[in-house]
Amino acid sequence: MPKVQSSQVVLDSAYRCFCRNGFRRTTISDIVEEAQLSRPTVYKYAGTKDEAFAKVVRVRLEQAATAAGEAADAARSPEAKVLGVLTVKLEVAIRLWDDSPAHAYELLAAASAHTPDLVAAYTDHLARLLASALDEAAPDAARQAADVLLTFTRGLEDDLRDTEAARLGLRTGVRMITSGALSRPVILPA
């Protein structure tokens, strides 16, 4: 099997194992069995369980970051750009919940604990996309609004039992938050 194909098989197998067993209960033996490759081949492409997990997280976040950038580029209005970026973020969480309803919380926590730099880089990328979308209309509030929008979306990701309600909540929240960020700022007394 060619290198790229073997590497992809190993990472796809690792993802399925993490989704099925959770982070704590997945072993390299599980990944070897799922990939139907030799143990040395799995170690070559995945490394340890922690390294395999980090590689899976990296690939998933890189794909999501690319999709978020494309969504922002395709949209015409600041609100549509924001909604496009945050829809990508929410859909990543929905996919994880669909793939691993029993272990989604654990996997999200493991990603934050075991790959904090990857998660932070992804979040920063999204914040820059959001701030850029809002910057022309609201340069003073763009980064703050981006942070609020990301926090709001993380809140929606906490309970994805009803994905349509989460999607509707995202659209409603984006409309409300961006309309506030894009309106003339109100200066409150100190």
What residues fall within each predicted segment?
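Amphipathic C-terminal alpha-helical segment
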Residues: E91-L96, S132, A142, A146-R167, ...
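Amphipathic alpha-helical packing segments from all-alpha helical-bundle domains
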Residues: A65, A111-A137, R143-D147
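Helix-turn-helix
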Residues: V9, S13, C17-E51, K55
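Hydrophobic/aromatic residues within well-ordered alpha-helical segments
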Residues: K49, V56, R60, A64, ...
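Hydrophobic alpha-helical connector segments
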Residues: K55, A68-R95
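N-terminal intrinsically disordered/low-complexity leader segments
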Residues: M1-Q5, P185-A190
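Generic hydrophobic, amphipathic alpha-helix propensity
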Residues: Q5-A14, I31, V56-A68, L130
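Amphipathic alpha-helical segments used for helix-helix packing
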Residues: A80-G84, V92-D117, L150
